[in-house]
From Swiss-Prot:
EC number: 3.4.13.21
Lineage: Bacteria, Pseudomonadati, Pseudomonadota, Gammaproteobacteria, Alteromonadales
Subcellular localization: Cytoplasm
Recorded catalytic activity of this chain's protein: Dipeptidase E catalyzes the hydrolysis of dipeptides Asp-|-Xaa. It does not act on peptides with N-terminal Glu, Asn or Gln, nor does it cleave isoaspartyl peptides
Gene of this entry: pepE
Biological process according to GO: proteolysis
InterPro entries: Class_I_gatase-like, Peptidase_S51, Peptidase_S51_dipeptidase-E
Alphabetical UniProt keywords: Cytoplasm, Dipeptidase, Hydrolase, Protease, Serine protease
Family named by the database record: Belongs to the peptidase S51 family.
Keyword Transit peptide recorded: no
The protein's name: Peptidase E
Species in which this protein is naturally found: Shewanella baltica (strain OS223)
Length: 237
């Protein structure tokens, strides 16, 4: 079996309905996977039931059987029994903290390595990389480790934008990622813009959507990655 992982920048693009833009990206991963487990642990400002309901509604046209991991007495068994794994956005630190709390980090990696499809957006994409050291989120809770699922051997930065509001004097996203590359010059970071996604199929990695991505690694800063690029070389990082 090979890894089949879709890493979405966001749950929306512009003013589109929740997950609507992602349906064409998600659909190919559901061909042989009907029963999905949704992990809502990144959702801090809403109940898990409310979060689950929004995902079920957003993906309703795919007619999937989606349950929340919080509805199962044994989270590990729920992962094993599912045909696919969905992890939504929110706070990445809280998400990873809960994944460690229920001892799911290694298990999810093992299940995806065996071919179980994985779909994440925002925080759910952040945790798919080597670590969560390039998340945009506030560290509201301290997980046991920043090490993440390692579904791809590099760092991700979802919602990438280097926009700076006039008169605002805080760091831009590019400046923050530059800081990471100064500390760790050998690990690539891919900034994925809202509306786009990375899709790993075994040894192949593709950029989906109509927006470029951006690469940061060592002295390479904010290098545009053209729409439709093959990024398979990053899997050898």
């Amino acid at each position: 079996m090979t890894i089949n992982a879709l890493l979405l920048s966001s749950s929306r693009v512009g003013d589109t309905p929740y997950l609507a833009h992602a349906i064409p990206f998600i659909k190919p991963l559901t061909t042989n996977a009907q029963k999905w487990i949704f992990i809502p642990y990144a959702g801090v400002s809403m109940s898990y039931d409310t979060y689950l309901a929004s995902v079920v509604t957003g993906l309703s046209e795919l007619e999937l059987d989606i349950s929340g991991i919080h509805q199962h007495p044994d989270p590990q068994q729920a992962i094993k029994d599912a045909d696919g794994i969905l992890i939504g956005g929110g706070n990445t630190f809280h998400l990873l903290h809960q994944l460690y709390r229920y001892d799911l980090v290694t298990l999810i990696g093992e299940q995806v390595a065996l071919g179980k499809p994985y779909i994440g957006w925002s925080a759910g994409s952040n945790v798919s990389g080597l670590s969560i050291r390039t998340t945009n989120d506030m560290p509201i809770i301290e997980p046991p480790s920043f090490k993440a699922l390692n579904l791809v051997p590099f760092q991700l930065n979802p919602h990438y934008s280097n926009y700076q509001a006039p008169g605002h004097n805080g760091e831009t996203r590019a400046q923050r990622l530059l800081e990471f590359t100064k500390v760790d010059p050998l690990t690539p970071v891919v900034g994925i813009v809202e509306g786009s996604a990375l899709w790993r199929q075994g040894d192949k990695l593709s950029l989906l959507g109509d927006q470029p991505a951006y690469l940061f690694c060592g002295e390479q800063q904010e290098i545009p990655i053209p729409v439709g690029s093959d990024l398979s070389h990053l899997l050898k990082a």
